Design a protein with these regions (language model features):
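Short glycine-/acidic-enriched loop or helix-start segments at secondary-structure transitions
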Residues: 32-33, 58-59, 105-107, 129-132, ...
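Residues at secondary-structure transition points
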Residues: 30, 78, 123, 127, ...
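Active-site/ligand-binding-proximal alpha/beta "capping" segment
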Residues: 99-144
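A residue-level signal for conserved active-site and pocket-lining positions in enzyme catalytic cores
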Residues: 94, 120, 156
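Short, glycine/charged-enriched secondary-structure capping and boundary segments
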Residues: 35-37, 61-64, 109-112, 133-136, ...
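Structured adenosyl-cofactor binding patch, chiefly the S-adenosyl-L-methionine
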Residues: 132-171
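Short, acidic/turn-prone active-site loops that include or flank metal/cofactor-
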Residues: 52-54, 124, 144-148
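RNA substrate-binding interface of SAM-dependent RNA methyltransferases
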Residues: 3-100
Length: 171
């Protein structure tokens, strides 16, 4: 009979994913905590919280991160364009997860090289800023079939990372 494993019974394998998550103006403590947890789950090398000072003492961050904020390498309160320029210079492929007039679906996107990836996500209400979108050549969106054109930023990041990791064979 199948039984759910406890945390202590779960075998963990740490992998180097060569992937960085860049958050452009994400401010909600619940989303920040959720993104820490997500980054730990996917083995993300680093997460940048641009334009946001992360309040690690926040009970909401602690609760939603389930202590992963203590495990994930991160930098906060930094300018998004500075991060984009630094990562591009280091050879990362920047990808914007945003529905735009030039975006492709995650399903149709093809990875054509083995460069490390920097996935950019945006603010809960306004998305990725226009000045950042103008500097990133590849825009990707999640195909959605309901009446809403957006989803929660943490959920979108999870879908985006999973789709990219399937294409890069990280799983």
């Amino acid at each position: 009979m199948a039984a759910q494993l406890t945390h202590h019974d779960t075998p963990f394998t740490r992998a180097k994913t060569n992937t960085i998550l860049v958050c452009d103006g994400v401010t909600s403590p619940a989303n920040i905590g959720g993104l820490f947890r997500l980054c730990d789950s996917f083995g993300i090398d680093k997460v940048y919280f641009c334009g946001t000072k992360v309040a690690l003492a926040s009970p909401r961050i602690k609760r939603t991160s389930r202590s992963t904020h203590l495990l994930v390498n991160y930098k906060d309160n930094i300018e998004t364009l500075d991060v984009l320029n630094q990562l591009t210079e280091k050879g990362y492929t920047p990808l914007a997860l945003e529905l735009t007039n030039s975006s492709s679906t995650l399903r149709d996107f093809k990875i054509t090289n083995k460069k490390p990836i920097a996935l950019f996500i945006g603010n809960e209400k306004t998305g990725i800023s226009t000045r950042v979108l103008e500097q990133i050549h590849t825009h990707l969106h999640i195909p959605m079939y309901g009446n809403n054109s957006s989803m929660n930023v943490t959920q979108a990041a999870a879908v985006g990372l999973y789709a990219l990791f399937e294409k890069t064979n990280y799983f």
